[in-house]
UniProtKB/Swiss-Prot annotation:
Highest taxon above the source species: Bacteria
Single annotated GO MF: protein transmembrane transporter activity
Annotated spans, Disordered: 52-77
Name this polypeptide is given: Sec-independent protein translocase protein TatA 2
Gene coding for it: tatA2
Entry-linked HAMAP family: TatA_E
A GO BP entry: protein transport by the Tat complex
Organism of this sequence: Aquifex aeolicus (strain VF5)
Protein family according to the UniProt entry: Belongs to the TatA/E family.
Length: 77
């Protein structure tokens, strides 16, 4: 018996139903999505957030690239 009162027979039945619902092809995809959801849930509980630091230099560089691209498109048109 596993923790939570689930026997081996019940676990096999649950896994068979999951296999029938998702199919063998989509099962890895579903597992990946489930794992990502659990990870995001844990991050939310611990208060972690993804914050990307952007330096002013990086922003200026991106703006220059966009301006050059726009100028090039105007010249080509």
């Amino acid at each position: 018996m596993f923790p939570g009162g689930i026997s081996m027979t019940e676990l096999i039945i649950i896994l068979a139903v999951i296999l029938l619902l998702f199919g063998a092809g989509r099962l890895p995809e579903a597992g990946r999505a489930l794992g990502e959801g659990i990870r995001n849930f844990r991050k939310a509980l611990s208060g972690e957030t993804e914050v990307k630091e952007v330096k002013a230099e990086d922003v200026k560089t991106e703006e220059r690239k966009e301006e050059k691209k726009e100028e090039k498109e105007k010249v080509e048109a």
